[in-house]
Amino acid sequence: CIRDSVYDPAARTVEQVVGGIAGASGLALDERTQTLYISDLGSRCIWSAAASARGLTAGGKGCQSSFSGLPGYPGALALDEDSTLYISYRWAGSSWLERHAGSTFLRGVALRLSESMQENLFSLPADGIRAEAVSTASGSWLWSFSGKPQGSSSALCPVENRVYFGIAGEKALYSARV
């Protein structure tokens, strides 16, 4: 299991924030509410916990699944000033991965494949959802972003009325108006 930790440069220590995550691939901090959001590839969900918390376990007291049943495997996260959480998707949902979700060995093998092999096996379809936006205040889904570029969204950044996307394997930056 992966542990999300925090480094204290003054004390030169690392403290565990959340354990029991099967593939932490993105973090976002809501400074207003001091909530930390963590994308989990293995569980296809977004966990949330207080930013000041230490020693939590995903799904346990103080660390709940805020958004689950996602259409793909979440990657990068970003949060705008209105507390809208943007979730990028690395891969489309995969029946093979879902069937073998209980096997830490097979899941580990899939996560350690080369990026090009992962893209070939689990790539998002041309018209698939690359990213979504959800209100953390209400839990309502605001936007879905789909598009023609092949590859998964490896980075995203909301700026005013646009969202910028980095697509794995592409030599261009994409954007969408919101």
Predicted regions mapped to residue ranges:
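A short beta-strand motif characteristic of beta-propeller blades
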Residues: 13-18, 62-67, 140-146
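Short loop/turn segments that connect beta-strands within beta-propeller blades
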Residues: 8-12, 50-54, 135-139, 177-178
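Short, catalytically relevant binding-site loops at active-site mouths
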Residues: 22-24, 43-45, 53-54, 71-75, ...
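Loop/turn-rich, solvent-exposed surfaces of beta-rich toroidal or solenoidal domains
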Residues: 74-142
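Beta-rich, blade/repeat-based domains predominating
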Residues: 3, 17-35, 69-83, 128, ...
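Blade-level signature of beta-propeller repeat domains, shared across WD40, Kelch, NHL, RCC1
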Residues: 153-178
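Structural signal for beta-propeller blades
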Residues: 4, 44-46, 93-95, 131, ...
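Conserved beta-strand positions in repeat-built beta-propeller and related beta-rich domains
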Residues: 20, 30, 36-43, 87-91, ...
